[in-house]
Amino acid sequence: MKKKIFSYQQIVLFVTSLSFCFYLLGYENFNFSNQSWLINGDLAQYQLGWKFYQEDIWRFPLGLNPNYGITNSSSIIYSDSIPLLAIFFKIFKNFLFEDFQYFSFWIFICIYLQALFSFKIIYYLTKNIPYSLISSLFFIFSTI
């Protein structure tokens, strides 16, 4: 028997997570070129760390971000700019548009993975698909 790539449960969780992410951020803020929602507070720090890192040359260690800081160099880790995504997207910096941001994508991934793993854990404990789907909705809507 051929194994399915995606089950309907994963599709339901994906669509629900995406819908909640649109509700949470707004459709316009889910655009990768919209930085207007990243100009205040900690979000501005995340975006600035990413911009300095994106515009700098490749250095070793990979997360080194010497232009971000006043007198001493820093690392992408200390600006909370999600180093895994920062290093990944820096590889493609010549193909990205100038005002690129990946934080809305990161928020969606966090919500979806929280839903998916909560479904898998609850299903492992109960073996009940409807109960697992409904329970995982609570994990989607309680963003921690």
Sequence positions of predicted segments:
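N-terminal membrane topogenic signal
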Residues: 1-15
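Membrane-interface coil-to-helix junctions
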Residues: 18-114, 142
